[in-house]
Amino acid sequence: MDPEAFSASLFKWDPRGAMPPPTRLLEAAVAPPPPPPALPPPQPLSAAYSIKTRELGGLEELFQAYGIRYYTAAKIAELGFTVNTLLDMKDEELDDMMNSLSQIFRWELLVGERYGIKAAIRAERRRLEEEELRRRGHLLSDGGTNALDALSQEGLSEEPVQQQEREAVGSGGGGTTWEVVAAAGGGRMKQRRRKKVVAAGREKRGGASAEEDEETEEGQEDDWNINDASGGISERQREHPFIVTEPGEVARGKKNGLDYLFHLYEQCRDFLIQVQNIAKERGEKCPTKVTNQVFRYAKKAGASYINKPKMRHYVHCYALHCLDEEASNALRRAFKERGENVGAWRQACYKPLVAIAARQGWDIDTIFNAHPRLAIWYVPTKLRQLCHSERSNAAAAAASSSVSGGGGGGDHLPHF
């Protein structure tokens, strides 16, 4: 056998067996390149914004509409200030904060930013106050007992709504509740209109003193309270936070006694003296009567239980206690024995005061001003009107008796 032929057959290589089919070569030529590795999905803008907002403590939402730069808000947050902290700060404290920001971070605030920060804080305060007012409005419009209880704890609340609800429940009427709510809303609208009238009157008077404004406002409020009930002379009823107690008796339960009520008037006198001392130190005009300034000072001092509606509501009861303590104590014992509520006792306090005014020429203002503890209080308009009415009745009775020649008329004190 030829060795060359053997080696040639052994090492013979057929290139056609090693080459791929033409179709596969074409597929390999046109095949797309492998895709790049997948990137992580982009973070949503809302999520990123919420993270930034959390880092700034809500300052970006507070400042974004007032031209404050993002870096400025970020540095304020870095100093540890939050929205709630800024809302509770005074203007002087805000100025100190902005000065500290400039000194610590060497960051010069623009003039518009300084004003914008204060404007944003004022706008946020107004928004929160409006939300609080709307919340209270919804609370009242619900007509629930809890809302009335909350108002009675604060001071005084209107009782006709509660009385109408009781009548509606007693009569079994299902649709009258909405009418009660509408009536309550109408009363609030009337009160707002009255406040606008009082404010307009102050602007017209111009140079009138603060105490004259207080006295005028007090008289107008009393007039409206008297004439609210269908134009009659019956006074608006209220939910009273007190109960009738005898002298020296300590009240039990949630409500306080009458000794506590009279003690509140003594506290008001102390607060007035403090306000007068502060005014003298500052060289300002000193108030001579218990005005809104005194009530605001009492609230700042922590005596939030002393408020203007409550103290003005019972001032004639305190006047009877000061002018004739024996008659006041006898009236308290009589109403306590009969189980009467404090509203009936309050109405009964008018008659002895009118009798005292009758013995002193019907001049109830002079009687108040002559007493050291009553001189700081305004005379209730209803008490003044009752004295005027009884004086007219007495004069008419005297004139008729002199004309007819008959006997003199008796005591014509009206029933309160």
UniProtKB/Swiss-Prot annotation:
Acidic residues: bias regions: 210-225
Record localization: Nucleus
Tissue-wise expression: Expressed in floral meristems and in indeterminate vegetative meristems.
Domain of life the protein comes from: Eukaryota
UniProt cross-references to Gene3D superfamilies, sorted A to Z: Protein LEAFY (1.10.4180.10)
GO biological process: regulation of DNA-templated transcription
Site feature location: Interaction with DNA: K285, N292, R296, G343
Disordered: annotated segments: 154-237
Segments of the chain annotated as binding DNA: 238-242, 307-314, 378-381
Gene Ontology CC entries for this record: nucleus
UniProt similarity note: Belongs to the FLO/LFY family.
Protein's recorded name: Floricaula/leafy homolog 2
